Amino acid sequence: MEVLLKKIGSLVFNFYKVILISASLLTILTTALIFRIDLKTDILDALPSKKPAIDVFVDFLNDFGSIDNLVIVLKSKDKKIDDYFELAESLGKKLKESAFIEYVDYNTLQTNREVMLRNFPLFLDKDSLDALRNRLTKEGIEKQIRQNKKQLLSPLSTPLDSEFIFRDPLNLRSIVLSSMSKQGANRIGIKQGYYISKDNCMLLLFVKPAGSSRDIKFVKGFEREIESILEAAKKEYGENPDLQMGLSGPYAFAMEAHTTIQKDVIINAITSIMLVFLLFQFVYKKRFLVLVIAGATLLTALSWTLGLAYLIFGSLNMASSVVTAMLMGLGIDYIIHIFNRCESEFIQSGDMRYSLDTPLAKTAPAVVTGAVTTSAAFFSIVTTSFKGLYQLGIIAGIGVLACLVSTLFVMTSLVVLMERQKKGLLFNAGGQRFGIDRISRIIKNYPRPIIFAGMFLLLASCIGLYDIRFDNNPESIGPKTSHVLLLEKEIAEHFGKQKNPLFITVTAENRERLMEQYGTLEADIDRWHDMGIIAGHSSLRLFLPPRDRQREAIDTLGEIRDALTLTGMENIFQKTLRENGFIVDKQYAAYMKGIRNALEIQQPLGLEALENNNDKKIRYFYNSEKLKAAAYLYPKDGKWDTSSIMLLQKETEGLGKGFMLTGTSIMFASLKTSIIRESIIASAIAFIIISCIIYLQFRAVKRVFLVLMPLFAGVTITLGFMGLTGMQFNYINIGAVTLLFGIGVDYGVYIFHDYLEKKQNTPEMVVQHAGKAVIMCALTTIAGFGSLATMQFRGIASMGVVITIGVVACLICALFFLPVLIHYLERKT
């Protein structure tokens, strides 16, 4: 390796201008590619693509599109939300006019008209059918018309009241809405068709965007459109301290997540760069030009890395988005070692050629070994099926090698260029000592206590290993604070805790069979509700009641027809209108005809009725192309327990072929074993590869043991600390273990390589010479990864915390335990 590195030194010394021009051209090209990279924030982009549980869930999303909906929330502090119906109407109309929106649902009376109006008795439960029977009697008609008159004469009457009374003078809508409000277990109130909470605090408008939440370009335009519409509505309605507007729903979360991660990535990149360079300058007190060279070297490597990432993947996901902070912390290590040695040699000799050859021949082998082991460990993560960790491993592995190449060629070329411009322009002695002398004295005076302390620490850590836990709750990787989720909790409090649903789907070979299966499913859903397994549900029955319920309604309609004279009912209606001062409008004839036709229904509706219905919400429950139906099952208090999920899975299996149960809770539960197993395999592969590389470098098993001791002990201490403190793994930070194998091995490599080169037989002298650089490498790594702890998404933040703990543990082991072990073991030989 030394021969090759010396040749690199000669190449750099003789062709530094060519190298810099070539590197600059390549950097310009890759920088242009960086601006094309998309940042995907959907958690599905970080999960495996070929897992049955995920495939079923993704199929559900593709078939029913339930994830792509937005909820606009109007809130009234004074519980006067019905004062804002006109605002809701104005908002609804503006939303309908937008090209970004497929449809809007804010008033149930404005949707599902064709089927519902013609066949409304089929949608009524038993109590509502009895109410219909009473409403159509002579007494019922007279009572309702008198109530209409009283309402219109009231000083609180609104234009909307007049319109509703004109359209439906018998107020049959109240009967229909009462029946519909009983379909779920939530506390939704439907007043004049609007979706409001029963405490009169909230009103909801449901929006279906025209594009997917995974289409980043569309999401940006859609977000601007929604903001514009809401602002226009506020200005039109005027400022009102009682009124608040907000966004909720999966689509709102996707918009918020994209904005949050994008902002976090930019801030984190800037923060990590500043921390690394401030730390570098504080410790080494280099001239400003050295900072420029280090910055150019790192940014060149980062540009190459992200350019290749675009060519390979085209985008970054939630996990791989942190690669900038990682490379800032790791890449500076190679610069520190090579430049410091170059500076030291130049100060002693004054010869630039010698000062370049010596660090490349003597120091660079350890740097190359460290970089290769680090990248190999990162590449080991590709053995996992989780796309987030897989992508992170490849990009980070490429990035480490890019930092190495950039250091060996770009940094050294810049050093030669600057020194040829003016000798002594870069190099100066000085810098912080980090208390290295004190550490050396401790190692010299207390070797045995250090050994015993290390053994005790490892023993305590091993005890903690038994308490390591994995959190498979999606919230463990979600945002720390989210306005969307906070509003979702408010909605749950006001409307009932209908969130975190499981989805059950049924498919059949034809419509007739699907209708039968749908009826079976509805009966079982009612049974599950009675058993207390579920708290509520939403299903196709909102648009098409099961056939057996329709038949029950048809039988009741027969009884109503027998009890009423339809012609007499119309005469009573017209007479009562005149007696109360109403004009008998021509449209009332059509109105009464519609009622008469509805009462004369003799056959139940089939799925064909849905396919002729223009209500877009039906797609959430019925896919006519694939002949699939879906129902949404809601848990008690918004959270599923393991026993309920297992019982529902067993019940679903008992329903037979064609029924499938899915949901995020099921999906993540099924992935837990997989991610743990694959992470252990990746870590084992990383350890084996690292061991082989270390052996090729040092050519002795005992030396391999010594070099790897700080890594093994540091990882054990980290895991034990997590177990003892209750810190849990999740789907993102579990990748930190494999990353730590690649990061922590470097410290042992640097210490032992320095020992071999200097032939220092005392452990304190090893620390005296190499300790400062090792501490600085650890601190810059902490600056890079530690900055992740400030990010909003818990998964990424916790990964930064785990790696920071691991780096500190590996550093302590390398600085204290390794020199003492070197002293004892090498002295014996």
Model regions and ranges:
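Transmembrane alpha-helices and their membrane-interface boundaries in multi-pass membrane transporters
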Residues: L311, M328-E343, T363-A364, V368-T383, ...
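Extracytoplasmic
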Residues: S157-F282, K286, G519, A589-I690
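Hydrophobic transmembrane alpha-helices and their membrane-interface caps
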Residues: F288-I338, R703-I751, G786, F816
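Pore- and gate-forming transmembrane helices of large, multi-pass membrane proteins
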Residues: I347-T384, L708, Q760-M791, L811
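Signature of alpha-helical transmembrane segments and their immediate interfacial
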Residues: M1-T41, S413, L417, Q421, ...
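Solvent-exposed, non-transmembrane loop/terminal regulatory segments of multi-pass membrane proteins
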Residues: I34-D78, S181-Y194, S440-R441, P449, ...
